[in-house]
Amino acid sequence: MLAQFDVNLVVLLVLLICGLLSQNAAVTIAAGILIVIKITPLNQFFPYIQAHGLNLGILILTIGVLTPIASGKLSGESILKSFISFKSLVAIAIGLLVAWLGGRGVKLMSSQPDVVAGLLIGTVAGVALLRGVPVGPLIAAGLLSLFIGK
């Protein structure tokens, strides 16, 4: 009986429940989709999802961030003004720092997969319990890389 016990499925179910209890749609939907994939023949796509899911997620996030520019909601004038406002210059600097940390995080997660579980647990807990957003693993890994010198 223990041989049939799937710890990973239980973890996904716990995440689904945490997402539901915290009313976090991102965690709920992600866990639900992964459960469906896991228990159906769709599980053959896990290698593809693992290989390309992060890049696809970053692409979708980038599209979401750039949409106000494309739609005209963020005018060219306000974009140009961002280079003369102190607050906007600080925002640009922080954006550069976070992008750099995310890049370090991707490298660390690729080279040291043993830290991925801890980063994921912390990120999911932050999303489910603290109303965070799931961009945390990359930034967390980038910060970790600064502490461990990788």
Swiss-Prot record:
Tell me which InterPro entries the record gives: UPF0756_TM
| A GO-annotated cellular component | plasma membrane
Ordered alphabetically, the record's keywords are: Cell membrane, Membrane, Transmembrane, Transmembrane helix
Task: Tell where it localizes.
Answer: Cell membrane
Does this entry carry the keyword Transmembrane? yes
Primary subcellular site in the record, as a coarse category = membrane
Keyword check for Acetylation: no
Residues crossing the lipid bilayer are 22-42, 45-65, 83-103, 115-135
Q: How does it sit in the membrane?
A: Multi-pass membrane protein
Question: What is the similarity comment for this entry?
Answer: Belongs to the UPF0756 family.
Can you name this protein? UPF0756 membrane protein A1S_2121
Q: Which organism is it from?
A: Acinetobacter baumannii (strain ATCC 17978 / DSM 105126 / CIP 53.77 / LMG 1025 / NCDC KC755 / 5377)
